[in-house]
Amino acid sequence: MYKRQNETQPVPVTIEKIVGEVSRTFNVSPADIRGTKRNANVASARRVAIYILREVTGMSMEEIGREFSGRDHSTIVYSLKTMERDMKNDQHLRETVSDIIKNVKA
């Protein structure tokens, strides 16, 4: 099967793209998301970034932990469980995550 010349390949979704989009959405710096700050807004943005990385890229928990200041995989598991619980109860969070995923895949 041949491609038409004007068809474009989807841009690969990178960690930087996901963290950048989460950063813009939550008004937090990418360095803070990947860093060790623990204030509520940064922690929320970090959980969203971790969740999206796992869902979109399929990275292992160990790989994700290394990208976020060397966090242990158990910390990543906790973040994912927290996000799953929060998304069940929070329509706005589900919409925010969905919008970020659409933007990083665009």
Predicted regions: what they are:
Residues M1-Q5:
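Conserved small/polar residues in nucleotide/adenosyl-binding loops
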Residues E7, V11, V42-A43:
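Residue-level marker of regulatory loop/turn positions in helix-turn-helix DNA-binding domains and
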Residues P10-T36:
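Basic, low-complexity segments
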Residues A31-A106:
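Terminal-proximal interaction/regulatory segments of ATP-powered molecular machines
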